[in-house]
C-alpha cells in the first residue's frame, strides 16, 4: 500500500455504497475535529481504471473535509479486487453506532455475495478444502450475531422502498418486517395501500398470517384488509428518543447506558416531588 494526498475531486464513492452520509451531530463533531486536527486516520482507496481513486473506507471523512473547506485528504492506496474491497467497506462501516436497518441489510448482502464469490474461486483452485461455515454464519460470528440474524436482515432487501422506509423510521418493527419481506412485490404494494387506509402497521401475528395466506395463494385485498382490521393484542410499551436531541445534555464521555440511568434517576426524583406536592 502507498500513502498519498489526492485532491478530493479525484476521490469517487464506492459503487452501490449502502451507507448514507448523514449531516447529524456526530458528523458535525467530525467536521470540527477535521478543522482543528485534520484527518488523523487516512482513508482507504483503490485505483480506478478511469483515473482517480474509489473510496473503500472514508466516505464520511471526505464529506467532513469538504465541509471543513479542505482540498485534499490523506489516503492509503491499496490494490484490492472488487470482493476484497467490498468486505473492507462493509466491515469499516458496521462498527458505527447508528445504522439503519436498510443499510445493515444491504451491507450484509453485499458482504455475503463477496464471500461466496471468493469461496467459489478458492474451490476452483484448491482440490481439497476442509469443511467451512456457511457464509452467513461466518458473517454472524464476525459481527457478534447469529447466522439467522444475518439471514433475516438480508431478507429485508426484498422489501419495496415504501415498506423499507417504514422499517427505517421504526413504524414497522423488525420481526413483522422479516415476515412481510416474504410477500410478493405486488402483495407488498397492496399492503402499503392497506396501511395508508387503516392508518396502522401490521403486528408480528398479523404479518405471519399474511405470509401464510400468501404461501397458500389466498392473499388478496379482502383477506389483507380483514387481517389488518383485527384487534391487535396489547404490545410491550417502548419509547425511543432521537440521539441528537438527548446527547447534548450529557458529557461526551457518557455511554447510552449511563444516559439511560441518569434519565431514570431524574424521573424518579420528579415522581417523588409530584407525590410530595399531592400529599400537601
Short names for language-model regions:
Residues 1-78, 84-98:
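Short, charged/polar connector segments at secondary-structure boundaries
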Amino acid at each position: 500500500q502507498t500513502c498519498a494526498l489526492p485532491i478530493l475531486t479525484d476521490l469517487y464513492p464506492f459503487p452501490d455504497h449502502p451507507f448514507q452520509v448523514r449531516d447529524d451531530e456526530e458528523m458535525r463533531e467530525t467536521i470540527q475535529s477535521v478543522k482543528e486536527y485534520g484527518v488523523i486516520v487516512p482513508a482507504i482507496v483503490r485505483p480506478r481504471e478511469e483515473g482517480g481513486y474509489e473510496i473503500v473506507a472514508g466516505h464520511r471523512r471526505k464529506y467532513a473535509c469538504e465541509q471543513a473547506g479542505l482540498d485534499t485528504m490523506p489516503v492509503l492506496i491499496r490494490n484490492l479486487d472488487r470482493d476484497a474491497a467490498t468486505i473492507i467497506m462493509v466491515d469499516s462501516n458496521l462498527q458505527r453506532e447508528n445504522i439503519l436497518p436498510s443499510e445493515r441489510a444491504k451491507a450484509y448482502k453485499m458482504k455475503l455475495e463477496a464471500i461466496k464469490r471468493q469461496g467459489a474461486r478458492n474451490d476452483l483452485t484448491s482440490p481439497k478444502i476442509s469443511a467451512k461455515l456457511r457464509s452467513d454464519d461466518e458473517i454472524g460470528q464476525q459481527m457478534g450475531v447469529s447466522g439467522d440474524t444475518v439471514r433475516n436482515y438480508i431478507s429485508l432487501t426484498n422489501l419495496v422502498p415504501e415498506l423499507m422506509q417504514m422499517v427505517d423510521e421504526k413504524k414497522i418493527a423488525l420481526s413483522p418486517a422479516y415476515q412481510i419481506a416474504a410477500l410478493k412485490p405486488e402483495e407488498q404494494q397492496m399492503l402499503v395501500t392497506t396501511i395508508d387506509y387503516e392508518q396502522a402497521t401490521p403486528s408480528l401475528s398479523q404479518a405471519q398470517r399474511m405470509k401464510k395466506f400468501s404461501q397458500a395463494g389466498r392473499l388478496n385485498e379482502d383477506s389483507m384488509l380483514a387481517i389488518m382490521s383485527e384487534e391487535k393484542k396489547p404490545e410491550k410499551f417502548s419509547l425511543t428518543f432521537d440521539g441528537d436531541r438527548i446527547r447534548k445534555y450529557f458529557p461526551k464521555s457518557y455511554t447510552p447506558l449511563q444516559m439511560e440511568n441518569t434519565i431514570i434517576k431524574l424521573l424518579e426524583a420528579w415522581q417523588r416531588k409530584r407525590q410530595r406536592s399531592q400529599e400537601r
